[in-house]
Amino acid sequence: MDFKQQVVTALTGVLGDSLPAEKVAQLIETPKTSDLGDYAFPTFILAKTLRKAPQQIAQDLVDQMDVAGFEKVIANGPYINFFLDKAAFSDQILKTVLTEAAKYGESDLGHGGNVPIDMSSPNIAKPISMGHLRSTVIGNSIAKILTKVGFNPIKINHLGDWGTQFGKLIVAYKKWGSEEEVKEDPITNLLKYYVKFHQEDVEHPELDDEARAWFRKLEAGDEEATQLWSWFRSESLKEFQKIYDMLGVEFDSYNGEAFYNDKMDAVVEAIESKGLLQESRGAEIVDLTAYNLNPALIKKSDGATLYMTRDLAAAMYRHDTYNFVQSLYVVGGEQREHFNQLKAVLKEMGNDWSDEIHHIPFGLITQGGKKLSTRSGRVILLEEVLNDAVKLAGAQIEAKNPDLPNREEVAKQVGIGAVIFHDLKNDRLDNFDFDLEEVVRFEGETGPYVQYTNARAQSILRKANQEVVVDDQLVVADDNAWDVLKMLSNFPAVIARASKEYEPSIVAKYALRLAKAFNKYYANSKILADDDQRNARLSLVKSVSIVLETALDLLGVQAPKEM
């Protein structure tokens, strides 16, 4: 039974044609406190049609309404407050969660439609810093949420694997590098060579000419240049993979910038054939005045193509390859103008599918309110932060539960999960402060708090040492349980909303609220008391664990059974 629909049916039964059922459903509210009921309907909208005061309308409707199936229905000023039948509600929600288990909350909103997600996208030969965390974990969580509601996400790591920097890198490697060093520690040493190049070219500007020459060779397909480029790329990817493995993130495609080298001329020709290219100071542009945007730069004065041309090629390739229903770019907010231009140029070219391209921007990670950039003159490496988080989690587990089996594995799940959860609990567009000790705390609004709550539920089930019987009447008659039950019933709507808003924080905040409600219930209930309610109480505990584990999984966070 859909309990909100029960309210809609009761209202439409007395409203007749005054208000369509869809509008009634939109107007129904959830009261802030349970003493005002479980659902409320404001009658203001009916005052004009019925020519009565809202208070009178509320009372008249209640007097005429069929209230069977509700505990009670009352007029409260201009509102009608609905109190659900707690026994029926409890039984149905718990049976649904226990029966559907990990599938609870699934839907077919997406009808299997393809959704490419451009995410993470680090630069080859440069380290993955804390700056890459957001795009990676937001993209991964959105993919999981979209899968849950019936879409088919395609996670694309659009690598920064092309550009003039590779000419510089080849020169630097040939002058100062060695194969052994690169194999031993690819990112550190390739970055070291690149930095040395920039230090040396101050005194030796001829290095820039050499770099340009090597990049031209690379563009022309020269064997040595291509072999070195390919090697730098594969060695970097091996290092990146270590971090992706730590985060539990996988990709469906690593097609980066280089993949589109042979696809850009066709884009320029297509723009030209539509009569959209204009010359401006020797460069070629598309005028976007009609969209209130700056012109899109397609070719530089030296004939070189730009990011915009490459991104146009990528967008068109993804449409042709995946026939997408949506195409997402999980990229920082500073790129907003670029993606507006991208969509506008595609639209001007006659591609109406550009309406389904969505830039998913996000805010910055800060430390002490300042942009997270460098520590002692270098970038803050994501791998170091994750390792530090694991150590902190391990120390807390050691103090709380020194005999825990698989302590090292649990420390990884908790430490890395804490970093991911902290990122995702914040509204995507907000900047947020990062303090590792706060992030890995077991109390407060943290990932470890949610994980610990789930481990507590699992511990209760182990102590009970009995199978939950789903066929019983699962009625938990307890005020503290009521808040938990209502929250469990909201989970499918939470997932649907998160999918529509591309907003993992909706799921993370829900998990925190459910954990808090369950801990209140735990503190005030004798769950393991041997009475006729024991099976129902254990079914509630098991349902909470199922939903917490599902919510954590949607965020890309693991849920250890013991902590």
Curated annotation (Swiss-Prot):
Its EC number is 6.1.1.19. GO terms for cellular component: cytoplasm. GO terms for biological process: arginyl-tRNA aminoacylation. Coiled coil: none annotated. One of its GO terms (molecular function) is arginine-tRNA ligase activity. It comes from the Bacteria. Signal peptide: none annotated. A motif ('HIGH' region) lies at residues 122-132. It is found in: Cytoplasm. Gene3D superfamilies: Arginyl tRNA synthetase N-terminal domain (3.30.1360.70), HUPs (3.40.50.620), Isoleucyl-tRNA Synthetase, Domain 1 (1.10.730.10). It catalyses: tRNA(Arg) + L-arginine + ATP = L-arginyl-tRNA(Arg) + AMP + diphosphate. Keywords: Aminoacyl-tRNA synthetase, ATP-binding, Cytoplasm, Ligase, Nucleotide-binding, Protein biosynthesis. SMART domains: Arg_tRNA_synt_N, DALR_1. It is an enzyme of class 6 (ligase). Belongs to the class-I aminoacyl-tRNA synthetase family. Monomer. This is Arginine--tRNA ligase.
